Amino acid sequence: MNVLIDNRQTKVDASGLEALVVRAIKATLEEEEVVDEVEVSVSFVDNEEIRKLNKYYRGIDSSTDVLSFPLMEFEEIEEGEEDEKDAEEIYPIGDIVISLEKAKEQAEEYGHSFEREVAYLTVHSMLHLLGYDHETEEERKLMREKEEKVMERLGLRR
């Protein structure tokens, strides 16, 4: 597993978050039984930058907590024949963009730690990169169950 982290904001102290994000990504991959070597890029931004990204990519002119940018359908990795796979190959599965400013606001609003919020947003986004969504009630319920399992694995239950 290769995790690239880029802190592109200065409004919120990001000390210690890199290790937490790596743990959250690893726990999600383990829970989903992903055995392939994957690469994930994570960017920490402020509300203004995520608002611009949200407007550009989704047509929504407001800040949000996290955006997920899958680079491929995860099934593409799983479906390759074993003899065609390079054992050393690392599959870039996507990018995660987290507004630390929004995460801090939400942690205060929900009454839990900033670290728990960042871990949750990372897990949520990882599930999107792995092909999950929450467009329907059924999808939302499944995704929520998976999020809770990973958060429990991390010792960060509600």
UniProtKB/Swiss-Prot annotation:
GO terms for cellular component: cytoplasm. Its cofactor is Zn(2+). Keywords: Cytoplasm, Endonuclease, Hydrolase, Metal-binding, Nuclease, Ribosome biogenesis, rRNA processing, Zinc. InterPro entries: MetalPrtase_cat_dom_sf_prd, YbeY, YbeY_CS. GO terms for biological process: rRNA processing. It is found in: Cytoplasm. Zn(2+) binds at residues 124, 128, 134. It is an enzyme of class 3 (hydrolase). Pfam families: YbeY. The keyword Mitochondrion does not apply. Single strand-specific metallo-endoribonuclease involved in late-stage 70S ribosome quality control and in maturation of the 3' terminus of the 16S rRNA. Belongs to the endoribonuclease YbeY family. PANTHER family: ENDORIBONUCLEASE YBEY, CHLOROPLASTIC. NCBIfam families: rRNA maturation RNase YbeY (TIGR00043). This is Endoribonuclease YbeY. It comes from Caldanaerobacter subterraneus subsp. tengcongensis (strain DSM 15242 / JCM 11007 / NBRC 100824 / MB4) (Thermoanaerobacter tengcongensis). The lineage of its organism: Bacteria, Bacillati, Bacillota, Clostridia, Thermoanaerobacterales.
